[in-house]
Amino acid sequence: LSLDGSKELNSILQASPDIYYFSFAPTTTVKRSNSHFHDPISETPILLRIRSKLIGSRIAYLDDGKKTDSLWFENDGIVNTISMYGPTTGYNGPDPILEFEEAELLIPGQWYWMKIPEMDHYSIIGHLGNHERIKRAEEYLIQHAIRLKGLPAE
């Protein structure tokens, strides 16, 4: 989905006040010590390394002339990590978005994101990734399923 397509979609859709929203935000890059660019870590699958390096150093432009900044460089090899937190564009402005904290009270209608370090796009979906990372991704997903099961049913 393009940046402009995301903005258009976010203008149509709104968070429901009765639904809990969660987002995983994997990253397989590290910020360079001498610049604001990001490079893939050594465990990033070979098929994602070049794309990860490109995303980690390119600015994107919207149709209205606005552009992304270095916050958009961190990525999972396919998607920039900042896009995974939740909807921030659209005519209605950003949805409420918070980093998930295990001990905090969860509020419906709000987005909660969870950073997953050293995790690439392939591994989090269980396809073509590193076996160790896929196993770790499974553990995240099982833990999240348990979390979801514990949410109040209305």
Label each residue range with its predicted role:
Residues 1-154:
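Lipid deacylating catalytic domains
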